[in-house]
Amino acid sequence: MTEYPNNLPKKKKYKISSLGKTARFRSYEDSFVWLNEAMIVNACFNATDPSVGLALSSDHSTQKCYMADTGLLVTQAFMSGKYTENDLYRSVLFDKLNINEGMITENVVAQMLRAGGHRLYFYSRSDSRERENHMEIDFLITQKNRIAPIEVKSGNYRSHISLDKFRRRFSQKIGKSYILYDKDVCVKDGIIHLPLYMAQLL
């Protein structure tokens, strides 16, 4: 667990093959299920063919594992530093630390979506020959009879290329599309932009 903060930003997706050439998900499945059910991690599975039944196309051998307690993640990330506890949190609050905000922000959103009753899914497809097919969506949820893609942005983002590609490719299956970021509510180009704290309302 102490290595978790170090690994989270390096590999967004956890591949079982990283454990060894002959590693198979079925050999480690019970361990991942235990971590998820013990609320130590929030597992997020790749939905390879997104539809209302996200579980039907979920690839459990490729998953993201978010820490279930973001406060614990931040504490573990800096527990070996020179900061006293109060100094650390003050530095985080006032943006005086050079940290991977994207990693922590995505972890916060995963925690809020799980607390809101959603199972976590994402979409990832790599295609070096056809750039239009190369994309990654941070989270997918279902709303009524449609899927809703969610992109999480930290800092001053300027584009959402993967979300645009996803909306073109799966336009018949998508209802609302969301970007969660650190600014006010607005709608741009058919995408609903919401402050990060509103993830709990989705």
Residue ranges with predicted function:
Residues 1-37:
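Conserved helicase/translocase motor-coupling segment
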Residues 30-202:
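A cross-kingdom feature that marks ATP-driven nucleic-acid transaction machinery
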